[in-house]
Amino acid sequence: MRKRIWVGLPLALVFGGIFAFHTVFHIPEQPEMTTISDGSFNQQLHCYESSTRASIDQEGSLNLLVWNIYKQNRANWQSVLTQMSAGAQLILLQEASLEDGLKRWIASGGWSGEQVNAFKAFDKAAGVLTLGWRKPRLACGYTQLEPWIRLPKSGLYSEYLLSDGQMLIVVNLHAVNFTWGVQEYQQQVNDLIAALKEHPGPAIVAGDFNTWSEKRLQAVTERLENAGLIEVVFSPDQRTRFITGLPLDHVFYKGLEVQKAEAPQTDASDHNPLLVSFTLPTDK
């Protein structure tokens, strides 16, 4: 009798864990995107297109905020987000949870945007969120499953018009974290930057790359450099770093000019934000 109990207990724990996982987490079969416009939030599958003719830059200037916002778990996230986004035309957030507080903040600022729902926990979506003061012409969501914990990370590919007539590609990435090698990591990066090699115009690839090892950092750097992108250098550089000393968050770009780049420190998230001021090329 005691032997049967010991045999049955592990099975009960396994099935109990599976039941609890599926009770807490909802993982969509394909990328689900929420589109945000004029204070409205609407569900859209995979891709979104618009006919906007408005340019994302402001008279040749483009200010960018990139930040893993830690699902807004810190009490001061809103005040810091307001401060850091002042003057920005483009915001790339990772681990953004579309709860009421963030929705109100987006609506009050008149932002347009898209969020890719990586998964829902207790019926609250979390994933990458790209916000702009103008709509994109195209936005497509991507997800890559974490091989160990079976929760996906998300990415968002967007195209914005620029005032000089060019098209700006923007990739907002939250890279997979828990992998034994770099195969899944490389696949996620490859999927999101596939169009960059064929794109002659400007591009920005930014987010939480989870580059906690030299192999990961080399894998992403080589692929982006092969696509013609350069990494932004920050000063001051208070980017969040792993115990290896490697930074986790990055901004890569091409076809633009960097005027200022800083990574200030904050306690409003477990990651520090990245602020970059770009201008359109003057020699075009």
From Swiss-Prot:
Keyword Isomerase applies: no
Signal peptide: none
Family indicated by similarity: Belongs to the UPF0294 family.
Gene3D superfamilies (alphabetical): Endonuclease/exonuclease/phosphatase (3.60.10.10)
An example Gene Ontology molecular-function term: catalytic activity
Keywords: Cytoplasm
Subcellular location: Cytoplasm
Record bears the keyword Cytoplasm: yes
Protein's recorded name: UPF0294 protein VV1_1880
Organism of provenance: Vibrio vulnificus (strain CMCP6)
InterPro entries: Endo/exonu/phosph_ase_sf, Endo/exonuclease/phosphatase, UPF0294
S-S bonds: none
Annotated SUPFAM superfamilies: DNase I-like
Primary residence: cytoplasm
GO cellular component: cytoplasm
Pfam families: Exo_endo_phos (PF03372)
